[in-house]
């Protein structure tokens, strides 16, 4: 759907949208890119949070006057549009032999690094070692893949976190806080 653009950071990446994807719904979609870090292949997952349209010709004061009179200028309207998205990275996995282990985005991938959409098959592959510990809370908001979450008890062992964690659910009246709380409680049932 696109490539890593500039400027990007370890917390938010610029996404230069390919011409073949400009008419797709991208906001809310889950993306994936591969990059090298410390000599190993890493795979980063993130959600596309925004898409912006720029056309530098339409921003020119002289062209704005012409556009105000004509509505569009065939030589530059639409043809010179560029679409840039923003992607917030939420999980990173390092390739470790035939498995994947959790990691972090400790470097910024090179511009031009391809970004593709994620489906359930990709998530199942990355999370295969943790299959028995996952709870699917529904779908990724604004997308189609199932949303995998870990809900660990406070004890030790493979299903335990070894310490207590707290969770807060906040939102406006009618936003689904109670429904979300019920779904999370099901994970512990």
Please place each PLM-identified region on the residue numbering.
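Beta-strand-rich binding-surface signature
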Residues: 30, 45, 84, 132-134, ...
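Long, basic/Gly/Ser/Thr-rich N-terminal segments
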Residues: 1-128
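Glycine-rich phosphate-binding loop of nucleotide-binding enzymes
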Residues: 137-189
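Pre-P-loop entry segment of helicase/translocase ATPase cores
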Residues: 126-139
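Short flexible coil/turn linkers enriched for glycine and charged/polar residues
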Residues: 81, 130, 141-144
